[in-house]
Amino acid sequence: MREIITLSFGQTAGHINADYFNSQEHYFPLATKSTSDPTVRFRRGVATDSRTETYNPRLLTWELKGGYGAFQAFNQFYTEGDKSQPQVWNEGEIKEIKEQPVDKNEYQKALDLGRENASQLNTDTTKRWTDYNRLFHHPKTRHQLDNWLFDPDTAPQGIHRGGDQKWTGFDVGVNEWEHVLNSDKEYLDSTLRSWVEECDSLGGLNVVVDDSAWAGVAAKILANYRDDFDAKGTVVTWSVEAKPEKKTRETQKNAIQTTVALSQVSSIYIPVSFPTKTPIDADFDPTSPWHQAALFGLSVYEPVQLMATQRTGGLSLDAMAALLDTTGERNIVSEVGGTLTDVDGDKSTVQYDSRLFQELFLPSRIPPKTPHVFSDLSIARLEDQDDDANSYRLNQPMPEVSSQPEFTKQFVSSKTRLAVTTKPRRTLLDMAKFVSVYERGDEREEMKQELGDMASKYEHGWEEESDDDDDY
């Protein structure tokens, strides 16, 4: 068995993973009919009654204070002081965090009674991912930064509890991580290490983060993981860019720091942008994180995740990384998309290509060329696969869970594609120019050189040497 542990940082990541793990619950009753092995993503456990077998996601979540909403660390299967699995959790007592309670929505109340109803969910009642989470989590999956507050209405970006500083910017996350380590030198030993060591054969880490201050936290945790636990293990990182905002020097600097730091600690780095317009029908609301996560899950995220859990004909995380990064030096995925087919045979294509590769940092007189594709991966779910070596077929049926929006019910099959292309080259060179023009300090020259070296890995053909309007 090649277990996969998912690390989820913040609300955007929480929505994506709540949708995914809810969907996986649908496959449990299918038993032998399911093509997916649940033990890759779920861990077996025993409830406090010493009789009931439980399955908990191999998932670690990080949130700001208030981010968990009504989601409780302890539940009917795990109570405070639970020592039912001492062979796994041997890093001290579980700490319960007290905070102002948030009332459960009607869907969660109905779930507690075993009477959930999809009509109880809408875009107003799903502002936190915990509003529609269906699964019990082990108490040690949950981690919280108490110095920062989240509220979907009054502080959607997150705010420092001592003032007006927002939870934005790579450096803000780095500073908070240093504060965490200063308070607890063994933080990673008591969080991530326990999960890694319980695995029979760790298949890798699946990481989801956005480009807020969480990027700084995630980059530091992964760097420490590389240094202390597993220097060569597979790490696949999905980085979701925030909603479009006015381009400033700060947002550009943040994009540079996020791209460099996360790509360096990842085997495969997949930056994505959620679309503001899609061909999906009017029931889809692009402003709803619940809707965006469900659409992304159906078209891209779940098919990719399912490949690593297939009993036969699948693709492990390390095999996927080797397929996409054929040289060991080009690990940035720059084309991400999916096509969904509905019951009438109509197709809707949604692209998640990062805005990094669509909007130049600095003005250029030369229009972008058609990108060269170095490698790609395509997954056909209940459809005919493409006729090439990097195409895979997925026979797992589409999920049917009450927690998903109504618009998802129309789709019966999908095709997903990830590709490594020449697109990052131009963006990385633009980043180097930005550093040259605007940055000062001792790290300026080192950062320029680093970005230039990264860009050179995405060159293709003799013409690449002359398509820049000036040197960086």
Swiss-Prot record:
Q: What is this protein called?
A: Protein DML1
Q: Where is the composition biased (Basic and acidic residues)?
A: 441-463
Any idea where this protein resides?
Answer: Mitochondrion
- Please tell me whether the keyword Mitochondrion is annotated for this protein: yes
UniProt similarity note: Belongs to the misato family.
Quick one: a GO biological-process term for this protein?
mitochondrion organization
Which superkingdom is the protein from?
Eukaryota
Q: Which SUPFAM superfamilies match?
A: Tubulin nucleotide-binding domain-like
Annotated function: Involved in the partitioning of the mitochondrial organelle and mitochondrial DNA (mtDNA) inheritance.
- Identify the PANTHER family for this entry: MITOCHONDRIAL DISTRIBUTION REGULATOR MISATO (PTHR13391), PROTEIN MISATO HOMOLOG 1 (PTHR13391:SF0)
Coiled-coil regions listed in the entry: none
Instruction: Respond yes or no to whether keyword Transport is given for this record.
Output: no
The record's Pfam families line, in alphabetical order, gives: Misat_Tub_SegII, Tubulin_3
Task: List the keywords (alphabetical).
Answer: Mitochondrion
Q: What is its main location?
A: mitochondrion
Q: Which InterPro entries match?
A: DML1/Misato, DML1/Misato_tubulin, Misato_II_tubulin-like, Tubulin/FtsZ_GTPase_sf
Sorted alphabetically, the Gene Ontology cellular component annotations on this record are: cytoplasm; mitochondrion
Q: Where is this region: Disordered?
A: 441-472
